[in-house]
Regions:
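Internal alpha-helical scaffold of NAD(P)-dependent oxidoreductase catalytic cores
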Residues: 50, 128-146, 162-201, 211-250, ...
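A short glycine-threonine-serine/GTX helix/turn-capping micro-motif
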Residues: 202-210, 258
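A general structural signal for well-ordered alpha-helical segments in protein cores
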Residues: 2, 44, 77, 89, ...
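NAD(P)+-binding Rossmann beta1-loop-alpha1 motif at the extreme N-terminus of oxidoreductases
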Residues: 1-76, 160-161, 224-225
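Small-residue helix-packing motif on alpha-helices
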Residues: 34, 44, 73, 89, ...
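NAD(P)-dependent Rossmann-like dehydrogenase/reductase catalytic/cofactor-binding core
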Residues: 235-311
Length: 311
């Protein structure tokens, strides 16, 4: 996910540099210098290979380091994107030296701006992170970074993500909201929703990519079974799904769209009835519900099972 997000942002910065009149909605200070930390030398090589072609020296810089450099990277950064597994959050943030790296420094009576931690860890809430920062890291309330929870998806890589950002009370400063919006609009669409909806958003927006991929694959399988070459079947299924999504994003209700294509006695209504007989609608809805519960459990939420499919 981190590679996808950085890919989108670096590509966008390059596009802005080529545009003589960037849009006025850009925040005053765009992020231009990036440090990525990964766990192994092989991962360093993989990330460098994926991202280096997107770096324009006149626009942005990128360093890829091993996770042994997490503390120094955090100390240097103004914005920290936390993209580890949920169970790793406490250990990563409580590493030796991290407290000092995250602490607001005071110089000649002037405090440096708070760091911003953006978490994309499924199931980990803002209160969870703030509790780790206070209890495990040892930061005082005065030194807590600004903590933001966001949930993008893997389509960040092609700047087609659907990102949901957790609203907080009291609201974030306008400058922070503008910066967050700018960052995540570089990789797709952005909405702000309250905390109690975030696990649902994780299911629908992040896990949903896999759900829709399965449906697309199934449609292509049907075409292949009837004689289509695999490559053409995959392309047709993907483009048809993109077209349907585009119509809905333009304001067409899915039920109306379905009805418009279903002529009396036609092939579409026949196929739709097979889908209904197979319980596709209920199965997809149930998958979203189940993934929502699992997302809440990843962060230690302890939500009850809603579908009875796990023990």
């Amino acid at each position: 996910m981190g590679i996808s997000i950085l890919s989108g942002i670096l590509s966008s910065l390059s596009s802005i540099a080529q545009d003589p009149s960037p849009p006025p909605t850009n925040p005053p200070a765009l992020p231009r210098h990036f440090i990525a930390t990964v766990r192994s030398p092989s991962s360093v090589a993989k990330v460098e290979s994926a991202l280096s072609p997107l770096v324009k020296p006149s626009v942005s810089t990128l360093r890829v380091l091993q996770s042994t450099s997490n503390v120094s990277a955090a100390a240097e950064a103004d914005i920290i994107l936390l993209g580890c597994k949920p169970y790793m959050v406490s250990g990563l943030l409580s590493a030796s030296g991290m407290k000092d790296a995250l602490t607001v420094k005071h110089t000649e009576g002037h405090a440096r701006s708070q760091k911003i931690i953006i978490s994309i860890c499924a199931g980990v809430t803002v209160p969870d992170l703030e509790r780790v920062l206070r209890e495990d890291v040892g930061l005082s309330a005065d030194n807590l970074p600004i903590v933001v929870r966001a949930m993008p998806n893997t389509a960040s890589k092609i700047r087609e993500s659907m990102t949901v950002i957790n609203t907080v009370d009291p609201p974030l400063p306008d400058t922070v909201t503008e910066l967050l919006t700018w960052i995540f609009e570089r990789i797709g669409e952005v909405v702000y929703l309250p905390p109690h909806l975030m696990d649902i958003c994780t299911s629908l927006c992040a896990s949903g990519t896999a759900f829709f991929a399965l449906m697309m694959e199934a449609a292509a399988d049907g075409g292949v079974a009837m004689g289509l070459p695999r490559a053409e079947a995959n392309r047709m299924a993907a483009q048809t799904m993109r077209g349907a999504a585009g119509l809905v994003l333009e304001g067409e209700h899915p039920a109306i769209l379905r009805e418009k294509v279903s002529t009396p006695g036609g092939c579409t209504i026949g196929g739709l009835l097979v889908l209904e007989e197979g319980g596709v609608r209920a199965a997809v809805a149930r998958a979203v519900r189940e993934a929502t519960v699992v997302a809440s459990l990843l962060g230690g939420g302890g939500a009850k099972n809603v579908n009875g499919t796990r023990h």
